Amino acid sequence: LVIENDKIAICISGGKDSFILAKLMQELQRHGNKHFDLVFLCMNPGYEPHILKQIEENAKLLEIPIQIYKSDIFDVSLKLNEHHPCYMCARMRRGFLYQKAKELGCNKIALGHHFNDVIETIMLSILYGGEYKSMPPKLKSTNFSDMELIRPLYLIKEEDYNDLSFINCACKFTKEKSSDSKRLKIKNLIKELKKDNPNIEYNIFKSSENVNIETLLGYKKKNEKHSFLENYNKNC
């Protein structure tokens, strides 16, 4: 994920995942065998003052030199879709981070998605999206040339650092609805399944490496849908 002379923007939201990512990357930079530069990028999409203050205090405590950039993404996404602003907000935030990272001379952005985010995304896509979609450890940007997204916490489980106390969610759209979120339902479902099968998390994770294309009715590649019938007679 990291190569010599990279300049990586560590994207900090204020939660435990992004702060753990920032600290681990800082330690890797100090003690690893590769030379790379880091920028600790925090976008303020419209956080409440006490949330922003807590982010700044935690960064100071961890000795992470964050750079905070103001935006009005919360307000804009709410105007665009009053009832369902989350999708638009997520897209706008990602675009803002890419743009700012590129302006700062970075070639990569790093996000704090971990092992549990990966398996929950797989289950969400199947049960709520009617598709099979995972979350790769690295991804080339389609909108920002020569930019790449990496997920260094990809193999780290949330339970490994879940006792740390940080902001759980700084988003004002979800703070009152988090108990009813689809992701939380999936998280609880996996927890229940794990009682009968301790390997359930690992099996979900490995499923994205063991897709048997010959048994699928179709697949998508570069937004183009393909049917199993395209090559059906060729296999006879």
Spell out what each predicted region is.
Residues 1-124, 128, 159-166, 235:
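ATP-dependent adenylation/nucleotidyltransferase module used to activate substrates
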Residues 3, 32, 36, 134, ...:
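Secondary-structure transition/capping residues
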Residues 38, 108, 116-192:
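Catalytic subdomain that performs nucleotidyl-dependent activation
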Residues 47, 73-75, 139-142, 156, ...:
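Residue-level detector of flexible, active-site-proximal loop/helix-junction positions
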Residues 51, 85, 123, 127, ...:
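Alpha-helix boundary/capping detector
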Residues 90-104, 137-144, 189-209:
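Short, basic, helix/turn surface patches
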Residues 166-236:
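The feature marks non-catalytic terminal segments
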